[in-house]
Amino acid sequence: MIFISINPFALKRFFFFFLAAIGLSCVSCFGQCVLLGVKTTPYDGQMSRIRWVLTADVPEGRDKVSLGMVNRWIGDLRSIPYGFKKEWKTPTETQSGSPADCKAKAVALYDRMQIHGATNLRLIVGKRTATSRSTHAWLEWDTPNGTYVLDPTINWKAYQGRDVGRRSYIPLYAFEGTRKFRAAPATLMAQN
């Protein structure tokens, strides 16, 4: 008769390795998401002051918004000192020069771009990095040249979405006009 002894410590290491492998395989889904339409988000109450910015009509006959213009506007907003405020600031309050947070700067850029005729623009609330503890706000702009990430709080210019990396700018919620979205990993959608 042969007796086999299983060391409990080795079993714990096996389960730790197994859970680590599952966790690392899930990391690859960051940055790849599908936006699902929703009726409400946790931010609806806070955003009541700036809802009109998101739902404003884009003026007809405006000049095309260039990447150079957007980079200038990002630089202007980036130079405003950072200061967190729970309440969302209006674009006018942000332009006053008093400290503004990522929400205020993103909404001010959204407003300025829309006034000048930009379309296919989304306000995103999500994580700046996969390990961020707090949420962050930025814009995504779809153009014929690709999707741009516009973050006037962190960056001095626009970056193409493919250049920011898979572990950066991870959306949780998106707002485009009157439409609201919840981000879901693309891998979950592929399984259904």
Give residue spans per PLM region:
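N-terminal secretory signal peptides that target proteins for export/translocation
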Residues: 1-11
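Intrinsic disorder/low-complexity segments
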Residues: 9-11, 27, 31
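Basic side chains
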Residues: 12-13, 105
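Small/flexible residues
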Residues: 14-15, 124
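Bacterial N-terminal signal peptides
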Residues: 16-26
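A structural boundary/capping signal
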Residues: 29-192
